[in-house]
Design a protein with these regions (language model features):
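Juxtamembrane helix-loop-helix connectors linking adjacent transmembrane helices
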Residues: 42, 55-57, 88-159, 280-284
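Function-critical hydrophobic alpha-helical transmembrane segments in multi-pass membrane proteins
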Residues: 112-117, 137-199
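Membrane-interface segments at the starts/ends of alpha-helical transmembrane spans
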Residues: 7-10, 45-66, 140-145, 244-251
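Hydrophobic core of alpha-helical transmembrane segments in multi-pass integral membrane proteins
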Residues: 71-81, 108-114, 253-272
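Alpha-helical transmembrane segments in multi-pass membrane proteins
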Residues: 18-85
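Alpha-helical transmembrane segments
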Residues: 6-21, 104-113
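Functionally important transmembrane alpha-helices
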Residues: 18-27, 189, 200-256
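Membrane-interface capping segments at transmembrane-helix boundaries
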Residues: 83-89, 267-282
Length: 284
């Protein structure tokens, strides 16, 4: 009976995150209405309040502030949740948790996971062009596509920490109390995909979530999945500055080969390094 309870409890973190996002949204809307409606009216009596509010609510900075506030609140809540409820250890013993071979493996996995995610996104977009249009529109309005200090802060640092605490920490630990690792990993990855609220990103996030869950569980530390997630997002953020290789057959073959080699070598090194760690050590 307890396992059934834990199974349904696994959905609570996702619901809590949605609530936090709503709170952050209403907080920023309230601040915007106060700033533009009350203070703005005093400073600029002739200004049209509704136009100023519309401009504020649709601005990139406004959207980014919502995400940053949400991320900071989520990191605090889920960090305490995991520490208190699941005895999380955020200061693990380096000798018992980290192995140089595993750290190198995380870096090697980055191009493979990025290329695989892009392939999944492109294939999904080819099958459903309407999903691709929605995905592109979402990114354009969110401001994530603009490479600024704020977007890098959120995308590369805050988002990976936030999402790993939600899904590979709290959600995974809860699911593990009801299911074997393989099913628990699929469940947290599915919730991770659902969290993104669009088909394109949700499908490749599901695949990425499986890899992150495996790395976290087998590595015995949330820092492995955080590191991979951070580097994955960093690659995506900086990819706009990479030269365009074109769409030739040669480029396609090279990308496929790099993807396969990256994933195979990365996982082999990771598991080889894991076997060198003390038995049953954990730094999650």
């Amino acid at each position: 009976m307890k396992k059934v309870g834990y199974f349904f409890y696994t959905f609570v973190p996702l619901l809590a995150v949605e609530a936090i996002q709503t709170i952050a949204l209403f907080f920023m809307m309230g601040m915007g209405m106060f700033g533009q409606g009350f203070v703005g009216k005093l400073a600029f009596p002739s200004a049209n309040v509704s136009d100023r509010l519309e401009k504020t609510f649709t601005s990139v900075n406004f959207n980014m502030m919502i995400m940053i506030i949400y991320a900071l609140i989520t990191i605090a809540i889920f960090g305490m949740w995991y520490y208190a409820r699941y005895e999380g250890n955020f200061l693990p013993s380096p000798k018992k948790t980290f192995n140089p071979m595993m750290l190198v493996a995380i870096v090697i996995l980055v191009p493979g996971t990025q290329f695989a995610a892009n392939f999944i996104a492109n294939l999904t977009g080819y099958i459903r062009p309407d999903w691709l249009q929605q995905y592109n529109k979402l990114f354009e309005t969110s401001g994530i596509t603009d490479t600024t200090f704020v977007t890098v802060l959120y995308s590369v640092i805050l988002a990976p920490i936030c999402e790993e605490l939600i899904f590979r920490d709290v959600t995974m630990r809860c699911a593990r109390k009801a299911l074997p690792f393989a099913l628990a990993n699929l469940m947290q990855a599915a919730l991770f995909g659902l969290f993104h609220l669009n088909w394109i990103q949700g499908i490749y996030a599901f695949a990425l979530g499986i890899v992150l869950g495996y790395v976290c569980e087998r590595g015995g530390s949330i820092y492995y999945s955080m590191g991979l997630h951070l580097l994955f997002n960093l690659w995506g953020t900086l990819s706009g500055f990479f030269p365009d290789p074109g769409n030739s057959v040669v480029v396609f073959v090279v990308v496929i080969v790099v993807t396969i080699v990256s994933l195979v070598v990365g996982f082999v090194l990771f598991n080889k390094g894991r076997r060198k760690l003390p038995i049953n050590s954990t730094g999650i």
